[in-house]
Amino acid sequence: MKKILILIAAVTLSMASFAREYSHDKDILYKGAPDGYTEKMCRIDVAYEKGGEKRPVIIWFHGGGLTKGKRSTPEALQKNGAVIVGVGYRFVSEVSIPETLDDAAAAVAWTLKNIEKYGGDLSKIYLAGHSAGGYIVNMIGLNKEYLAKYDIDPDRQIAALVPYSGQVITHFAQRRKQGIPELTPPIDHLAPLYLVR
């Protein structure tokens, strides 16, 4: 029995040695705050491993229909050692979609300026997001104007866009604001499909 307990302890300890230990810096303001709402929403969290070689960086935009949701650094993304930047942004109930997209671009700019101190590799910057976050990723990655405002060229400085379930037509939040019927799929300057090159 004693040998079995020793074996179980050894296996458990060896498994723990393979578990990744992430540090977390939270609630970092990434954009000048002209008002209380911007100061509250334009914040990021960074999850990273200390020491070692430079690591890929995933800038993660949460979902929520552009009207709700919360920034996060998903645990599923922390399994391979990447630095994860979870971005909060202002919702379209309070600002326009272009202002929300500018928040996202400002978060990317903050990341490019600061991520090396977290072990991030500037040659491996990935923009990723789910649902509304996927829409944001497509819009700021395909419409160069958003990132260009911050002297960023997505063709040179972003390794890939990884949108999960992001809308590619004009976002439903914008269609609702304009009174466009739900089954009408407009493709205008606020649609990733309009920007495909």
Q: How should each PLM-predicted stretch be described?
A:
Residues 64, 72, 88-95, 167:
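Short beta-to-alpha linker loops that shape the active-site pocket of alpha/beta-hydrolase fold enzymes
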Residues 19-52:
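N-terminal cap/lid segment of alpha/beta-hydrolase-fold proteins
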Residues 109-176, 188:
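Primarily recognizes the serine-hydrolase "nucleophile elbow" in alpha/beta-hydrolase
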Residues 70-87:
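Short amphipathic alpha-helix adjacent to the substrate-entry channel of hydrolases
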Residues 54-63:
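Short beta-strand element of the alpha/beta-hydrolase
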Residues 6-18:
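Hydrophobic h-region of N-terminal signal peptides that target proteins for export
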Residues 186-197:
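Serine-hydrolase catalytic core
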